[in-house]
Amino acid sequence: MARNMAHILHILVISLSYSFLFVSSSSQDSQSLYHNSQPTSSKPNLLVLPVQEDASTGLHWANIHKRTPLMQVPLLLDLNGKHLWVTCSQHYSSSTYQAPFCHSTQCSRANTHQCFTCTDSTTTRPGCHNNTCGLLSSNPVTQESGLGELAQDVLAIHSTHGSKLGPMVKVPQFLFSCAPSFLAQKGLPNNVQGALGLGQAPISLQNQLFSHFGLKRQFSVCLSRYSTSNGAILFGDINDPNNNNYIHNSLDVLHDLVYTPLTISKQGEYFIQVNAIRVNKHLVIPTKNPFISPSSTSYHGSGEIGGALITTTHPYTVLSHSIFEVFTQVFANNMPKQAQVKAVGPFGLCYDSRKISGGAPSVDLILDKNDAVWRISSENFMVQAQDGVSCLGFVDGGVHARAGIALGAHHLEENLVVFDLERSRVGFNSNSLKSYGKTCSNLFDLNNP
C-alpha cells in the first residue's frame, strides 16, 4: 500500500512539474506577445513626432500619446513654451497618473516652489489634489495664464527602425502641467487640448526626451504647408551615421545646411541674429533699434535689426512697427503700383493676383555678419487672403513688439530647421525644400509601422 502511494505521488509530482513548465512557458509567450505590441523602453537614436497644420488658424499641432492605457492627445506646437500642458478637468483617465507633493524633487526639477490647492472640486481627480506643486501655464496665442497642478504620467513617442517609423518608446514619469480648462477655450485649433512646449526649460518636451534616452541635444523641425499632409519634429542627431537609413531621402538637404548662431533668452526663447532684410538688392535697416530694453538678450546697440525670435504660435511673421514701415515701402516699390488693392487684415499690403503674374521680388534675411542668407520663398511670404487677392504675409506688431522680427510658422513651412542646442546654432537651407524637389511630408517616412 505504501509502495503504491509513493508511486502515485511520484507520478503526480512529475505531472505537476510538466504542467507548471507548460503554464510558465505559455505565460511567458503571452507576455512576450503583449510587450511586442506595446511601446518599448529601449534606447533609440532618433525620435519622430508627426505634426499637422490647422487650416483655419495656420498653426501647427501634434498628437501626443499619453496615459495608461495610451491615447492620443492633440496639442499645439509651441516652439518657445516651457513645458507640456493639457486640460485635465474632463475625460482624463489614467492608471499611472501621479501628482507630486509640494517641495518634492519633481517640483525642484520643474523649477517651481509654489504649492497648489484645488478649489474646483470636492473630490480628487487628475489636476485637482491638495498639497501638490503649482505650475503656471500660458496660452501662447491669447497670452492668458493660469496656475495648474504639476503632474507625471506615461508619454510615448515613435522611434525609428531602418528607413521607417519604428515602435513607440516610453517615458514612464513624464512631467507636465494639468492646466485650467479656460486656457484651451480660445485661440487654439479645434479639439486641441493644450500646448507642447519646446523652449529651453527644465521640463520642456525635448529636454525630458534628451535626458531619459541619452540623445544628443538637437531637434529638427519641418512644418508642412498643407493641412492634408504631415510634417515632423525629429529629436536627436539627424547627422549621426546610425540614422542614415531613416534620413536617406534627405541627405542632400542635410549636406547643404547653413548654420547661424543661436541665442536663447532668459525666458528660454530662440533667437537668431538678423542684420538686414533684403528685397531684391535693396537692404532694409531701420534707423532706430526696435527693442524695448537694452537688458534684452536680443538687444543690439547698432543700427542693425537685431535678434529675430523664431516662433510657431504666430501664423505669420511679425515685424516691429519701424521695421514694418520701411520693409513694406521697399517691397511696394518693387511691385507694380497698379496691382495694389485695399489691404485685407491682418496684412498691410495686398495685390490683385491677376496683375502680379510676373511674381514677387526676392526677400532674404541677411544673418550673421553677412555670411549666411536665408531666402524666403514667395510661397512663404505671399498669402492668398481672398479670392484673387494676394497679400504680403508680414504683420505690423506695433511699437511694443516682443522682438524686432518674430519669424512665424508660415515662414518656416517647407524648410528643415535644425536646433543644435549643444553647439548653440540653428541650421537651415538657403532655399526651401521645393528647390530639392521635396516637401516636409516626403522628406521622412511618417507612415505608421
Swiss-Prot record:
One of its GO terms (biological process) is proteolysis. The keyword Secreted applies. CDD domains: xylanase_inhibitor_I_like. Undergoes very complex post-translational maturation; the proteolytic processing leading to the formation of two alpha and beta subunits is incomplete, leaving a certain amount of the protein in an uncut form. Glycosylated on alpha chain. GO terms for cellular component: extracellular region. The record marks 295-296 as: Cleavage. Two-subunit monomeric unit made of alpha and beta subunits coupled by disulfide bonds (at pH 4.5 and under non-reducing conditions). Can also form oligomers including dimer, tetramer and cyclic hexamer (trimer of dimers) (at pH > 5.5). Component of globulins complexes which accumulate in seeds. Interacts with flavonoids (e.g. apigenin glucosides) present in globulins complexes. Forms a static complex with vitexin. This is Gamma conglutin 1. It comes from Lupinus angustifolius (Narrow-leaved blue lupine).
